[in-house]
Every structure is written in structure tokens, then in C-alpha cells.
UniProtKB/Swiss-Prot annotation:
A GO biological-process term: 'de novo' cotranslational protein folding
Keyword Cell cycle attributed: yes
Top-rank taxon: Bacteria
Gene that this polypeptide is encoded by: tig
Protein name from the UniProt record: Trigger factor
Native source organism of the sequence: Prochlorococcus marinus (strain MIT 9301)
Cell compartment(s), UniProt: Cytoplasm
Amino acid sequence: MAKDALIVKTTPLPQSRISFELEIPSETCKTCVNETISTISRSAKIPGFRLGKIPKQVLIQRIGITQLHASALEKIIDKSWQEALKIKSIEPLSEPELVDGFESLLAKFSPEKSLKVTLQTDVAPELKLKKSKGLSVEISKTKFDPKSIDEALEKSRNQFANIIPVTNRAAKLGDIAVVSFKGKYKDSGKEIDGGTSESMDLELEKNKMIPGFVEGIVKMKIGDTKTLNLKFPEDYSHEDSRGKEAIFEVNLKDLKEKELPELNDDFAKQSGNKESLKELKKDIEKQLKDNFEKTQKDIKIEALLDALTNELVTEIPKSMIDLEVRNNIEQTAQRFAQQGLDVKSTFTPELVKSLAESTRPQAEKNVQRNLALKALAEKENITIDKSEIDLKMKEYDDVISQSSKQIDIKKLTEVISNDLLKEKLIIWLEENSEVNEKTTKTSKATKTSKTTKATKTATKTTKTTKTTKTQNKKEKK
């Protein structure tokens, strides 16, 4: 090996990291120092000297040897790092980290001597599936509830209802109460954050707001003021309020009720642009059944992906999860921007930190799943042909030609390729796995506890003893 050649030694580390131990020859150090001096000389302004004509010693005296060495050292490390990656044919996933720190290296740096540097970086993890074929999962198979059709119709009636004033009676369940209220904690007397409103339309339905709030308004008359002694649920969305007793001063300002339209052909034309009520019901039934079947399929796919991920043996680098978290936050910011919100003022450092913490578990799960699917593709040699991508790309021809914005074709092709491969991998999983379907009978889902800041939904499910097995394997033709 030439005396002035870079010496590179690599050592694998946990969590898919690699340590690079570099020995950088003195010739490289000298060259980078001289190049740094030349670069600074071209832009430095010193009275009595022309640009680019400042003597070396004068320049060093002016900027200081430490500053010069710091600039040169950055160049030395970057140049040697890029060369080391080429020598070892390694593609890093993250920026390199100096083990000893820059200040420590700078303190012992001398252009006349070789320099030893240790850098660490994340690399693509090695993937192994303990098992890919014959995965077995159990899912709860819920039967379609025909009552959901009537519920959908009733919801539609409520949407098209006429709102009429009520003046001659007290409030009852089903009414729309216009209320003002002010809440405070019973123990401290402190006002509740989000617990005050000057005027709010509140549908008087059980389990809306915190327990007892709606019930306390029932039987009130317009103009009445009432004190409600309530307690926040232990699982309330805001941690500071959980389990605390509260006092609400409520005033009933106005009262309205819904006048529901009759279920007839006229209603079908008004609500769904259908000629008859029969046709409307048929359309609603189709939509609900389609959604139901999609949900059932999604449940099965989720179970299969979880099972596959459990077979994955790998060490996921932190940088992959960090990138997924960052992408999730950026997507959230884009949605905010599309809604017309000011992203800069909304996404404070505190909010970004909170989002990063709350989305990290799901981000880690997403990365694990993607790696499991990648491992499956490699193990079973599942690929996407160029013809498949081209065929799918044709579906976007009109969108591309009519778009006012420049579309990144390369990125679009990559997204389409990844989506097609994922679809093919999921189909393969369905065909080569066993799904045990446990039939369940589901009762009505009840919406509960709609507060000013959060809504919770509780669903009760009763299991039956019947169990069915289905083998998701296609017959070979």
C-alpha cells in the first residue's frame, strides 16, 4: 500500500451501525491545508495586499492558525469520508458522527503527521425472515348488520332536517340547546382550559360532553341558569382534567328542535338524487357493504402484516425511524397548509416535539413492516416488471398533462413501483397463509363522550362460539 494512501478499517456495531477507523496520511493533511489557504486568500481583504496575493505567513497571522486548521480539518474529514465509502462500497443511511469530537481532533491536529479519525454511521440493516410461508393468523369476522342501512337513512334525515325554534316547553333529549357555560375545578377554583363558551349549539344526546352535562340541561327552560357539579372521566383526553371534580355554570340561551323529513320518494330525490326510496336504500346498502368488505379485508391484511413482521430478524437503525417520524410530521404540515392554516405559526417547536414523541411508536411499526415486506420480496424473489409500471403510469397520463405544476416523473415512477410491489407481496401473503376467522356478532356501536376538545367511541362486541377456518390459497390452474 502506498505511503500516502488512506487506510480504512470497518467494524460492525449494534443497531446496524458501522465504525470507520481512518488513518489519513500527512500528505492529504498538507494538501488540504494549502488548498484552504488558497481558498481564503482569494476572498480575504488585508490592507496593502491585492486579492489572492497575500503572503501565506501574513494570512496565517491574520486569521489565526487554529481557525485555519479548523477549516482544513473539515475538508480533510469530508474528503477522507467520501473516499472511505468508495473503498468499502458502503452507502450510509445517516451523516457520519465523529467519535472523539471535532474539538479533540483539532487540538492534536498537525499537517506534518498522519491523522487517525473514527467515524460512525447507520447502514441498511441485514434482513432475515424466520418464516414466510404458512403463516397462521386469527381474526374476528363480523357479520354485516342490516340495521346499519336504517341508521344511515336516519343520519341522512337528520342532515336534511328543518331546525325550528322551541318556546313553550323545557329542553329534552334530541333538542338543540344554545348554551353559554363556564367551568372551573372544584378543588382549586381554577378555570378549565377549553371549559368556557359564550354561545354553543349542543345537540342533547346522551354521552355527549362529559357525564352529566347533557342530562343537567334537560328540563331547563330558556333563560334558566343552573350549576352542574360534575366529574371528568379517568380516561379524559386532557391529562390535567382526568378524574377531577368540576363546577359548570350553564345558561340556556335558546332552544331548537329538528323537524325530520318523511322517508319517501321526495326525500330520496332530495338527499341522494335517486328516483325512489327503494333505489336510495339499495344504493346505501351497496356503499355500506362495500365499506364493510373493505374493512374486513383491511383487518385481515393488518393481521398478516403483523404476523410477517414478527418473523423478521433485524436491527433497525435509529436514523430510519427518525426519517419516518420526520416524513409523518411533514405530511401533517402539508395537510395543515392545504386547509389554509399558517404552518409556521402553528408548528411551534413544542408541537413538533410533541408530534415526534406521539408518532414515534407508529413510525417504528411502519419501518418494521416495510423491512419485513422487503425481506419477503428478496426471499421469495418477488419483483415488478417494467411493463407493469408502464401500464400503471398510463393511468396518470391525463393528470400529468393537465397538471399546472411540474410533476417529478422519476419520483412518481418510484412511488408507483413501490405500491405495485406492496400489492403483489400482500396478494402472495394471502395465498400462502392460513387465516382462521372467528365469527362474532357485533351490537350497535355507541358514540360517547363528545367534549369540546375530544370525542370517544365505545363499542361492545359479544363473541359467539362458532369458529371457521379459511385457507387463502388459490387453486393452481
